[in-house]
């Protein structure tokens, strides 16, 4: 009889768990939502125009916005994180379009320099093969249930890696704050022959009472189907400091 009463109590937190919120203007997040569901995380997808006025009740808010980021949405995201929320910023939520949102970029602690890529200027390439490299082998987000299927040389070290055959890469993100680096990127520009190795493909940082995280890969949505990458994003959603 004790077991019969205990079972509902153990299951109750799972049944009562609130969905995470995905704010998006792109189809690729549908694949992410499926992957989160497969990992036991329910999600609700909205546009920035239809998002709830208050975000405080969500255990995590994921942002995937390619186009213009409205002032109202920007403020809501920043307030949510600073008030104790977990804001997960994906792919082109940091891109040249977001230069129009200096408050957003300052909050993230990222700048996108002008100028030629060879001189440190921001540039994107698409579609290209990209290697994501584990730079945090002791961090829970980068390791918990993550089965890395590849290895790559990175700054003279052999590291766990994810090989993405066709995605979009952003070069020369400049990080200006106390970012905890999770993922690096390795990309070979076939035209110039230059190999770029940068510690900018995944990170997180404190945002007053909460957290903000960023993961670069996700242009087509197929990236979210990679088992290791899907698990990393699941870990980000489930992260408890």
Q: What is each stretch, according to the model?
A:
Residues 62, 88, 182, 213-215:
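Hydrophobic/aromatic beta-strand patches that form the interior of the parallel beta-sheet core
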Residues 18-102, 224:
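Helical hinge/lid and interdomain linker segments adjacent to catalytic or ligand-binding clefts
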């Amino acid at each position: 009889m004790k077991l019969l009463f205990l079972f509902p109590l153990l299951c109750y937190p799972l049944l009562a768990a609130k969905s995470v919120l995905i704010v998006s203007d792109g189809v690729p997040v549908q694949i992410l939502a499926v992957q989160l569901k497969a990992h036991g995380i329910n999600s609700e997808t909205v546009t920035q125009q239809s998002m709830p006025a208050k975000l405080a009740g969500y255990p995590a808010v994921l942002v995937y916005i390619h186009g213009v980021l409205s002032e109202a949405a920007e403020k809501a995201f920043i307030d949510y994180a600073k008030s104790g929320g977990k804001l997960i910023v994906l792919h082109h939520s940091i891109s040249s379009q977001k230069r129009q949102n200096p408050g957003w970029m300052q909050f993230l602690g990222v700048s996108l320099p002008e100028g030629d890529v060879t001189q440190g200027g921001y540039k994107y390439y698409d579609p290209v093969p990209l290697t994501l490299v584990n730079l945090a082998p002791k961090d829970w987000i980068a390791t918990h249930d993550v089965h890395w299927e590849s290895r790559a040389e990175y700054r003279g070290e052999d590291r766990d890696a994810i090989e993405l055959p066709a995605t979009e890469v952003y070069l020369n993100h400049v990080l200006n704050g106390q970012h905890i680096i999770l993922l690096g990127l390795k990309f070979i520009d076939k035209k110039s022959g230059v190999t770029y190795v940068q510690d900018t493909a995944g990170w997180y940082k404190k945002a007053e009472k909460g957290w903000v995280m960023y993961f670069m890969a996700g242009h087509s949505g197929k990236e979210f189907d990679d088992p290791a990458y899907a698990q990393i994003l699941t870990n980000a959603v489930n992260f408890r400091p």
